[in-house]
């Protein structure tokens, strides 16, 4: 395996070091190439993602990212220049976000909710394509538009990915949208789900409006298995999914080119947390679970299962506080 590693900013290098420690135990001999992309490079050279780096990234089987963002750089500069550009250049049309409440982890929900579902979010369309504009700016008559772009091609490939996930899990898929108001895009999403769903007769299909889905994710999260949704609704609902299952500190994600043409990128959901960087206070669990997602994506399900089991064992036994390295050592020993 050839792995591109982008430690990034803040706590990124610390959590990635522990994730790689675990990876080296379950899959020895991975060929790694580290890229110094992030705030330091931006300040030193003015570069965020040089054109010369993209062809190099494409030569790898996968990309592992730590965290991006630094208070010394204006908000959004690094995120747009690195994360969004990578997503579009490498056609990461699937954003995969598992949500699982591990034993030993407290949920803000009452009782012991059954939480084990995944959200499949479309990643390259919707209102995030930069289509729109503004006129009469800074006048009383200013008008701004933000256009949501939805294509049959873009929707179908994400829907197919979601159905395949559902087929391999508990065979239940929920489309989340707002078809009663967003009638044009909603109709296209619903028809695509209906047509692709006919090819997966074992998968039960349901629909929920986005507002209803947020309610049920809090009151009855066990009803969900695989959720498929668009870019904007997915952006919102995935953070809620992380919150009910213990917080973004435990949330892993995959930005995936389901065609396999380009390497997919895996990362913890949490930010760079510059206030605790360098203090070994960061929890590397989300980065380690991102390695599990990476291995699952590449077909090494056995190694991924070993990581998941080791993480579950560690979380169930945790008490008090532990350093970043201590947590990484414990999970590496448990795999």
Curated annotation (Swiss-Prot):
Binding locations of NAD(+): 271-283
Keyword Coiled coil: no
Cellular component GO terms held in the UniProt record: cytoplasm
Site entry: Important for catalysis: 128, 178
Purpose: Catalyzes the oxidation of 3-carboxy-2-hydroxy-4-methylpentanoate (3-isopropylmalate) to 3-carboxy-4-methyl-2-oxopentanoate. The product decarboxylates to 4-methyl-2 oxopentanoate.
Protein name in the entry: 3-isopropylmalate dehydrogenase
Binding annotation for Mg(2+): 211, 235, 239
CC cofactor: Mg(2+); Mn(2+)
Cofactor annotation comment: Binds 1 Mg(2+) or Mn(2+) ion per subunit.
Assembly: Homodimer.
UniProt keyword annotations, A-Z: Amino-acid biosynthesis, Branched-chain amino acid biosynthesis, Cytoplasm, Leucine biosynthesis, Magnesium, Manganese, Metal-binding, NAD, Oxidoreductase
Its EC number(s): 1.1.1.85
Pathway given in the UniProt record: Amino-acid biosynthesis; L-leucine biosynthesis; L-leucine from 3-methyl-2-oxobutanoate: step 3/4
Top-level enzyme category: oxidoreductase
SUPFAM superfamilies registered for this protein in UniProt: Isocitrate/Isopropylmalate dehydrogenase-like
Pfam family, one: Iso_dh
Catalytic activity: (2R,3S)-3-isopropylmalate + NAD(+) = 4-methyl-2-oxopentanoate + CO2 + NADH
Similarity field: Belongs to the isocitrate and isopropylmalate dehydrogenases family. LeuB type 2 subfamily.
Compartments (UniProt record): Cytoplasm
GO biological process: L-leucine biosynthetic process
Binding site for substrate: 87, 97, 121, 211
Record GO terms (molecular function): 3-isopropylmalate dehydrogenase activity; magnesium ion binding; NAD binding
């Amino acid at each position: 395996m050839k792995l591109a590693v982008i430690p990034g900013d803040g706590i990124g290098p610390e959590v990635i070091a522990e994730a790689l420690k675990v990876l080296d135990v379950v899959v020895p001999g991975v060929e790694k190439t580290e890229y110094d992309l992030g705030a330091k490079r931006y300040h030193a050279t003015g570069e965020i993602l040089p054109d010369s780096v993209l062809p190099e990234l494409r030569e790898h089987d996968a990309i592992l990212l730590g965290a991006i963002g630094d208070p010394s750089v204006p908000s959004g500069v690094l995120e747009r220049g690195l994360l969004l550009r990578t997503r579009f250049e490498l056609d990461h049309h699937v954003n995969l976000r598992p949500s699982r409440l591990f034993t030993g982890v407290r949920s803000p929900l009452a009782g012991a909710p059954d939480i084990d579902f995944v959200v499949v979010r479309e990643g390259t369309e919707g209102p995030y394509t930069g289509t729109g504009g503004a006129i009469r700016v800074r006048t009383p008559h200013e008008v701004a538009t933000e256009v949501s772009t939805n294509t049959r091609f873009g929707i179908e490939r994400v829907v197919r990915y979601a159905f395949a996930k559902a087929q391999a899990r508990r065979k239940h898929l929920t489309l989340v949208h707002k078809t009663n108001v967003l009638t044009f895009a909603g109709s296209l999403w619903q028809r695509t789900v209906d047509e692709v769903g006919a090819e997966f007769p074992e998968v039960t299909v349901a629909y929920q409006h986005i507002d209803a889905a947020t309610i049920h994710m809090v009151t009855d999260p066990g009803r969900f298995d695989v959720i498929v949704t668009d870019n904007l609704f997915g952006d919102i609902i995935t953070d809620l999914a992380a919150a009910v299952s213990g917080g973004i500190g435990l949330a892993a994600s995959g930005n995936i080119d389901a065609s396999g043409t380009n390497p997919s990128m895996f990362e913890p959901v949490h930010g760079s947390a510059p206030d605790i960087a360098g203090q070994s206070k960061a929890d590397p669990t989300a980065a380690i679970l991102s390695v599990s997602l990476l291995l699952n994506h590449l077909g090494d399900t056995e190694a991924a299962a070993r990581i998941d089991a080791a993480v579950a064992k560690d979380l169930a036994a945790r008490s008090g506080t532990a350093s970043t390295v201590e947590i990484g050592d414990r999970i590496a020993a448990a795999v």
